[in-house]
Every structure is written in C-alpha cells, then in structure tokens.
Amino acid sequence: MTANVDGVPEKFATLGLTYDDVLLLPGASEVLPNAVDTSTLISRNVRVNIPLLSAAMDKVTEARMAIAMARQGGVGVLHRNLSIEDQVNQVDLVKRSESGMVTDPITVHPDATLGEADALCAKFRISGVPVTDPAGKLLGIVTNRDMAFESDRSRQVREVMTPMPLVTGKVGISGVEAMELLRRHKIEKLPLVDETGVLKGLITVKDFKKAEQYPNAAKDAEGRLLVGAAVGASPEALDRAQALASAGVDFLIVDTSHGHNSNALDWMAKIKSSVGVDVIGGNVATRDGAQALVDAGVDGVKVGVGPGSICTTRVVAGIGVPQVTAIYEAALAARAAGVPVIGDGGLQYSGDIGKALAAGADSVMLGSLLAGCEESPGELMFINGKQFKSYRGMGSLGAMQSRGQGRSYSKDRYFQAEVSSDDKLVPEGIEGQVPYRGPLANVLHQLVGGLRQTMGYVGAASVDEMESKGRFVRITSAGLKESHPHDIQMTVEAPNYSRK
C-alpha cells in the first residue's frame, strides 16, 4: 500500500476538519463590523442580503419561516414533504405576502358569498379583495370593514361591496404617485386598471409600510419576497419543479442525500433544462462530487453529508466528510466554474458562519439554529416549565413514514422510495426537540452580528473577501476547551451562546 511523506497509507491520508477543529486568525484590518457587505450569491442569478438560508426541512421552513427569512435579507427553502399542490400554495403565500405591485391579485366574483370572501382573506392574510366580472373588469372592492358587522355569511358580495367608481391608478404608475393617491384619498388599496377597466394589479399601503419596516428584505425584480423550494430526483420531481416555477419560485434545490449519484445527476440536468429558474444541486462532500454537479449544469452546489445535529448518516452508513474540509474541497471545483457554494449543516454558533465562508462557502443553510424560532412549523411544547419546539431530520422515521396516507415525499431523498412498508425503512436521522428561541428576527440579529464581528477581525469587507483573506489555525481539544467560557459558573445567559 502506498504511503505519503508522513508514512500514512494513502487510503487514510486525508485529514477532515470541522468547525470545532479550527479558528480564524485575526488579521490586519481597516474594516468596521457595521460597514461590511453581507450580500452574496446563493446561485448564479439569485442574490440575498445576508448569507443565510433556512433548511428545506418540515420542522424548519414553510411559508411563515420563508417570509420572515426574506424580510431579514436571507431566504427560506420550502421543504418537499408536501404534495405538489400544497408546496405550490406555500410559494404563493410567500409571493403574495408583500410586493411592489400585486400583478395577479386575488379577486372574488360579485355572486360569491361573504363566507367565501372572508375565507380568501383569511387564507392569504389580506384585509380585502377586488370584485371582478368573468372578463376581469373591476366592479368594486370588498374589505373586512364591509363584512365585519354582517352576521349572515350567505349574503352575496355585491350586496355589501363598495362599488365602482373607485379611486384607481393606471398601469405603470410610479411608487411616489401611488403613495400620493393612497394618502390623498385615505385609502389602503389602489387597484390598477387598463383603459377598458380591466383589473391589472393592486398596490396596498401595507406594502409601502413593510418596505420601510424591512429595508434589507431580499426581493425579486417585481418587489416580491424571494423564496426557494426543494424537489427530489425522480419523475415526480419534474412535475413538481415545473409547477413551482410556474408559481413564481426563485430557485429550486434538487435535494438528495447523495448528489454524486448518476440518477440524481441525470434528474438535475433534466430539471435544469425544463425550468426557467436557477437549480441548485446537492448534497455532496468532495471535490469530485462538486465537479459532477457543475458538469450537470447546476447553478449552485450544496455541501454537507452528515454534519447536521439530527443526522445519523455518518454512523448508520459510515459516510461523510467533516464540514470545513468538505466545503473547502467542493469550493475548489465550484468556484473555478463560477458556481456558488452553500454549506449545509453542522453550524452551532455564529462564529461557524464565518469559518464556512472562509473555507469557501458563499452562504450557509441553517436547520437546528432556526428550528426553535417562533416562525418554524414545529410543535411548541412545555417540558418542566421550559418551552421547546419539535425538530427532526428528513431521514428520520417520522419524516419518511407515510403514516397510513399511502405516500411519503421524503423517502426518495435517501433512495428508499420503493420501500413499501414503514417498518422496513432504514432511517438516517432522529427526532427530538430544541429550546424555543423566540422570533426569528432576534435570532438572525445575533447570527449576522456575530458574522459582522468575524469579518471585522479578518479584515474582510465582503463575503468574497472572507474566502480570500480568511486564514485558519488548527486547534487541539485543549484549545477548544480554552475557546469556550471556562473556570466559571455562568449566572446570566448570553443571547448568542449556550454550552452544547
């Protein structure tokens, strides 16, 4: 057996490092943390304002989390443990949550009942809807105020709506002009109509207020919040991808446990050629794996095999690469091709984000750090007087089981789609709980604040400079112990630190 210069057999020569194995060296710096640029590309054509994505997991990201992530400048990736219709509806909820102008507003027919109109308002969290005829001509508007004191929910909308003429705007109106009309007439909604009176859009005062409230929000060219979605690698995935693209999703992630698999690569290429949005491939953990994704034509590479807190792939299958090394190796292939890298999993502290970026990632995907947030879909539990939220891996039994519904949308991620009986599944994840952490905005404030401090220490004014200027020192177990608070009993907890 051949050996390297240290006498280690070549087969065992690679040293794998993860976040706790390294620290970043402080460097000469003229950079102030509050002046750094945290924007980055997560794929060839999608840019966010902070380098954070919420994971495509059913206890982490649905519409509420995706909306909150985009408002803070990041982006959420909707999980795929849903039917195609339900996942498309999640995209629609995000895209309709706010926009510069709603180009396809929800409308109601004048013969609809108040109960039906109220249900629409509740579903999309809106305060009113335009009333149109079958040809799309604007007839009036019905709002919560019109319906508030109507006890008979079977009455028709035409009986209580505010009919035309309404204050309207022309298609192409500027934001300044629209705001002036809203202010002058003391209204909250401005329908936009063409010369024949057909409804073409809707501008609301709520969207102007949200733009002021969330100035760092990540938005598309139409002023709508960014959102991504996960799909699999199967014939069903092609239908799912096309439906999601039609719904306005900004990018797709072909989400498999082993992206360096010929079947997965074939489906990535097929999906990429059939949709008009960026496609990110994953997951891989080697340079060769990343190169295979690049060769398949993906717009982004997602890195991570087994680093997540709820993942058991490394012990069940004996497979994986410690995450810092995995990111570094994958970036050698991806960066040369101009393809952004996403480090997925294994992050415990804000300092790990900077380490991932210095290793070669353009952004990171977070699961456990966000699972305890108010906006996550996990169940809230009280245990011994403390609050927790449920969290699980997508390879856990709970995520892969069909539960009598005849279909699971998660099994194929781990190449077990053909397993017909739940008791024959081989899980690669666990189920558990994480402490409740409150609103996402507070959590991201600490994470991004920690990243800004990292960039200041390194002397990196941008995310790109983190990779070029970041230098590592490998540490021992004693060095790791020294890095954490020690020789003291902590009496007041910090919002950004807890001993794991």
Q: Which residues are covered by each model-predicted region?
A:
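Alpha/beta catalytic cores of nucleotide-metabolism and tRNA/nucleoside-modifying enzymes
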Residues: 1-28, 108-109, 169-170, 230, ...
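Active-site-adjacent beta->alpha loops and helix N-cap segments on the catalytic face
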Residues: 34, 83-92, 150-154, 174, ...
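Bateman/CBS regulatory modules and CBS-like beta-alpha motifs in cytosolic regions of diverse proteins
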Residues: 34-48, 55-57, 86-126, 131-133, ...
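Short beta-strand/loop segments at the ligand-binding rim of alpha/beta enzyme cores
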Residues: 47-54, 100-105, 164, 220-230, ...
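Catalytic cores of alpha/beta
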Residues: 64-67, 239-246, 285-303, 343, ...
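Glycine-rich phosphate-binding active-site loops on the catalytic face of alpha/beta enzymes
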Residues: 71-86, 249-261, 299-317, 347-381
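Catalytic beta/alpha-barrel core
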Residues: 78-81, 107-108, 128-130, 168-170, ...
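Terminal amphipathic helices with adjacent charged low-complexity linkers/tails
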Residues: 80-95, 131, 135-151, 182, ...
